[in-house]
């Protein structure tokens, strides 16, 4: 398979793309036949895929490219044609590009599940983290086929049980530093209370989460904050479900903002019209649930996230829609009304070195977060360090106490000292401040105090620091 991955010299590739090609070839040379290539949203997955295809075609091989949705088929074909690949057939009923003799076949996983697999030597799986039974069955049954998976977020449960190797040529942070992805700034205008929301199939229950996010305070804040801080930027808004996203769209429209709503049932013609108007600036805001989380390269410079999630994959996919560098936009602003960045971390801090190997009936083990962001006390930007890179404000930690994973922990040396009343007051005051910042009641701070000291803070003053 190594000789199928020859790098064509037709175009100059970016350094991380050249590195990715080499890493995949090296992995193939080591005997791996099912390789996942991690590449951030906006980092050129299509160009990389075209190089894999060209290398295979040069050796007389046949290729199948699978997309996670029918709506992405034409987009994929156009992208490959722009890279000079023309011998393409589409595996889809009544499609004008249907050509079973073409050496490159493009199909959605939905169509592939209803068809016989054509003869191929290489299968490229786009958005490989979206697991499809037809692809997985093929991987288990056909040892003669070489598989390459493409994903910005290859962290789905059990991927390591199917794929042999994960390669990552460049992180999101490195791509931002090199100018290939946009710089971004995250704000948390609201911190919803999700304590009572149950978990269903690994994520927040949609109906209960909608109830929290549809409250007057948060719904009013979404539009008000955008009008005040959104700078009229082209914006994608993510809601909890269709009803919630449509309601947000109506609120924007009532405020006089040109807004569209799009979901999985939006027909192709209307979707194309919305995209055209969005690109021209006729539409400023597009609201959806998950329809716009993959395969979208619209010129976005603002993300409004109003959909709480426990999924790192979904979190990064949403923010990733705005990381692509576009002419006329210098950076990305993220307004996280769902608190996802506070719970899961900034997208530059989310990274996994290996594929997950959790068996089907076991729960995927959550990794401990190294450092979760907190709001800068001056400009409100979510940051992980003590000094804000945007305004220069320095957060002063309380001596002997630091924050970790949303809790206050005491740093001790040697024997534990008996805390003084002032130290207890300092801790309680900080807990009250943290509760205020997160929109919690004072009882949360009292419980945190009791957890640490074993008693309630009855003799202390309710003052914040």
PLM regions and their residue ranges:
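Post-DEXD/H (motif II) to motif III coupling segment of the RecA-like Helicase ATP-binding lobe
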Residues: 130-186
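Conserved interdomain linker/interface between the two RecA-like ATPase lobes of SF2 helicase motors
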Residues: 166-239
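C-terminal helicase lobe
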Residues: 313-317, 323-430
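Conserved Walker A/P-loop ATP-binding site and its immediately adjacent core
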Residues: 57-81
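Conserved helicase ATPase core of P-loop NTP-dependent helicases/translocases
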Residues: 90-100, 246-247, 257-289
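Walker A/P-loop
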Residues: 31-52, 238
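Conserved pre-motif I regulatory segment
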Residues: 2-38
């Amino acid at each position: 398979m190594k000789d199928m991955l020859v790098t064509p010299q037709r175009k100059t590739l970016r350094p991380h793309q050249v590195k990715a090609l080499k890493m995949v070839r090296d992995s193939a040379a080591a005997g791996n036949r099912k390789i996942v290539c991690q590449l951030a949203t906006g980092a050129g997955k299509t160009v990389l895929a075209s190089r894999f295809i060209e290398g295979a075609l040069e050796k007389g091989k046949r290729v199948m490219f699978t997309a996670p949705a029918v709506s992405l088929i034409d987009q994929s074909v156009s992208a490959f044609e722009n890279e000079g690949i023309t011998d393409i057939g589409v595996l889809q009923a009544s499609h004008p590009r249907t050509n079973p003799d073409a050496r490159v076949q493009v199909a959605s996983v939905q169509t592939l599940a209803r068809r016989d697999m054509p003869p191929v030597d290489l299968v490229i799986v786009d958005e490989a983290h979206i697991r499809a039974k037809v692809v997985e069955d093929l991987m288990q049954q056909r040892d003669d086929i070489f598989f390459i998976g493409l994903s910005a977020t290859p962290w789905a449960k059990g991927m390591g049980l199917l794929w042999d190797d994960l390669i990552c040529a460049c992180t999101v942070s490195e791509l931002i530093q090199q100018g290939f992805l946009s710089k971004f700034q995250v704000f948390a205008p609201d911190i919803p209370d999700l304590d009572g929301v149950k978990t269903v199939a690994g994520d927040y229950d949609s109906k209960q989460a909608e109830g929290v996010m549809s409250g007057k305070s948060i719904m009013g804040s979404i539009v008000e904050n955008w009008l005040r801080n959104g700078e009229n930027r082209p914006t994608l808004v993510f809601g909890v479900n269709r009803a919630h996203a449509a309601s947000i769209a109506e609120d924007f429209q009532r405020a006089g903002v040109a807004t569209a709503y799009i979901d999985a049932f939006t027909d192709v013609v209307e979707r194309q019209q919305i995209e055209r108007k969005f690109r021209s600036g006729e539409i400023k805001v597009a609201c959806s649930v998950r329809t716009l989380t993959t395969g979208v390269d619209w010129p976005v410079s603002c993300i409004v996230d109003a959909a709480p999630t426990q999924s790192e994959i979904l979190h990064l996919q949403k923010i990733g829609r705005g990381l692509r560098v576009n002419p006329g936009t210098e950076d990305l602003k993220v307004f996280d009304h769902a608190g996802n960045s506070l719970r899961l971390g900034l997208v530059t801090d989310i990274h996994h070195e290996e594929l997950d190997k959790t068996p089907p009936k076991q729960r995927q083990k959550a990794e401990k977060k190294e450092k979760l962001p907190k709001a800068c006390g001056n400009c409100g930007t979510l940051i992980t360090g003590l000094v804000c890179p945007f305004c220069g404000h320095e957060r002063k930690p309380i001596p002997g106490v630091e924050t970790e994973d949303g809790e206050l922990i005491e740093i001790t040396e040697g024997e534990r000292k008996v805390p003084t009343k002032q130290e207890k007051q300092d801790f309680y005051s900080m807990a009250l401040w943290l509760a205020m910042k997160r929109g919690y009641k004072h009882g949360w701070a009292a419980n945190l105090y009791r957890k640490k000291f074993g008693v309630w803070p009855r003799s202390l003053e309710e003052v914040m620091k």
